[in-house]
A protein has these predicted regions:
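Glycine-rich/acidic phosphate-handling loop/turn and adjacent ATP-lid/helix
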Residues: 188-222
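Conserved catalytic submotifs in the C-terminal HATPase_c
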Residues: 131-143
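Conserved signal-transmission helix
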Residues: 1-18, 55, 60-64, 200, ...
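Conserved glycine-/histidine-rich ATP-lid loop and adjacent helix of the Bergerat-fold HATPase_c
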Residues: 227-236
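Conserved DHp (HisKA) dimerization/phosphotransfer helix of two-component histidine kinases, i.e.
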Residues: 49-125, 131
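Short beta-strand/loop element within the Bergerat-fold HATPase_c
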Residues: 172-184, 191
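Glycine-rich ATP-binding loops of the HATPase_c
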Residues: 177, 235-243
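Conserved micro-motifs of the catalytic ATP-binding
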Residues: 100-104, 144-147, 237
Length: 264
């Protein structure tokens, strides 16, 4: 084994332990100072207002001379507060993804909330954030169902990434994702622009899902899509994929009434 192979082996070992061993500590170490910055900034805003009010009462002439400078100071503090809140939102998006990956047990899952978190996480990929026209329509009344957040997060990450990359490689660069529900299913529809997927590839994919096989060769549909749909198949999901000249759609309907996931 040469140095390159040794490095690759260590790199893979590092990646394999990164989420479980390092991410919780990294998030914790970021959260504490960030919360401190936000709290101190709010406190500073209040103190500035209170002290300047006292200054105007005791030394009105001096306060009048300092008014312009005080307005600049308050504006700067507001900017710091707004930027720290923006950073906090970004931090929450990152944390939500890694907490989802750690939630391997069975729990109540809301599909719209999960998809919203996944889409916010994809904003960290700047090509996918800026170069694709996205249409996101989420059913805020979608009911929960029982499942593993970790499994579902990984499955929908793979499906969304596949669709977004195909959209990115197309002329129209369009992507849409929709959630909805009826009296039995919560459903997700993922649609992207791009060349039509070969019917033969779709047929092979559906056969693999039915058989539980993870073999997927000589196909424009990557193995990540197959693995994602195999996971969803354990939830008794209705899975369909169809493709036309310029768009492809993956639809998944997961039962939520008196249904428990099948574990294979």
């Amino acid at each position: 084994m040469d140095n390159h192979e040794s490095y690759q082996t260590l790199e893979e070992a590092f990646a394999a332990t990164f989420i479980k061993e390092l991410i919780p500590g990294i998030l914790h170490n970021f959260a504490n100072p960030l919360n401190g910055i936000m709290g101190r900034t709010k406190l500073l805003q209040r103190r500035i207002e209170e002290n300047f009010k006292k200054l105007k009462e005791i030394y009105p002439d001096a306060a009048a001379e300092m008014m312009e400078e005080m307005q600049r100071i308050k504006k700067d503090i507001r900017s710091v507060s707004q930027e720290s809140e923006s950073f906090h939102d970004i931090f929450k998006d990152v944390a939500a993804k890694f907490y989802a990956l750690a939630a391997k047990g069975e729990d109540n899952v809301n599909i719209s909330q999960l998809i919203n978190s996944e889409m916010r996480f994809f904003d960290f990929n700047l090509d996918l954030k800026h170069d694709i026209k996205k249409n996101i329509r989420l059913d805020n009344d979608a009911p929960d169902f029982r499942g593993s957040t970790a499994e579902l997060s990984m499955a929908f990450w793979a499906l969304i990434r596949f669709a977004m990359l195909r959209a990115l490689g197309s002329k129209m660069k369009e992507f849409s994702i929709t959630t909805e529900h009826d009296n039995k299913y919560v459903s997700v529809f993922i649609k992207n622009s791009g060349d039509a997927l070969p019917a033969a590839s779709i047929d092979v994919l559906m056969e693999r899902i039915d058989s539980g096989s993870r073999e997927m060769t000589n196909s424009v549909i990557d193995r990540g899509v197959l693995n994602a749909l195999l996971i969803l198949n354990k939830y008794n999901a209705r899975i369909n994929m169809f493709s036309e000249e310029s768009f492809s759609t993956i639809s998944i309907g997961i039962p939520y009434r008196n249904e428990r996931p099948k574990r294979k």
